[in-house]
Amino acid sequence: CVVLVMCMVVIAPMAEGAISCGAVTSDLSPCLTYLTGGPGPSPQCCGGVKKLLAAANTTPDRQAACNCLKSAAGSITKLNTNNAAALPGKCGVNIPYKISTSTNCNTVKF
């Protein structure tokens, strides 16, 4: 019982600040057309990219966002990997990793 309480005390603060994959998916859903080979990203897409970058302001948040992006990239059937990698730059932001199914999110730092 004491161990369970200790785990809850240690894990709860970390979970509270973590970015959810639902939020990542929601923010980037306007990017789907571009990510599957469509023309440049829409203003709504870039707004979502910028919102996500602003929300990921700690190393754990950036790693969580990276893992969500990696998972989402793997679930997009016709993902254009070049467009995925170019997305941040097309939106005028810099993220410290490539949006890819092969990214090692454990190496992402703030």
UniProtKB/Swiss-Prot annotation:
SMART domains in the cross-refs: AAI
Residue ranges crossing the lipid bilayer per the database entry: none
GO MF term set: lipid binding
Region forming the signal peptide: 1-17
Disulphide bond pairs: 21-68, 31-45, 46-91, 66-105
Record Pfam families: Tryp_alpha_amyl
Keywords, in A-Z order: Disulfide bond, Lipid-binding, Signal, Transport
Keyword Zinc: no
Function in brief: Plant non-specific lipid-transfer proteins transfer phospholipids as well as galactolipids across membranes. May play a role in wax or cutin deposition in the cell walls of expanding epidermal cells and certain secretory tissues.
One record GO biological process: lipid transport
Homology family: Belongs to the plant LTP family.
Keyword Iron among record annotations: no
Protein name: Non-specific lipid-transfer protein 4
Species name: Lens culinaris (Lentil)
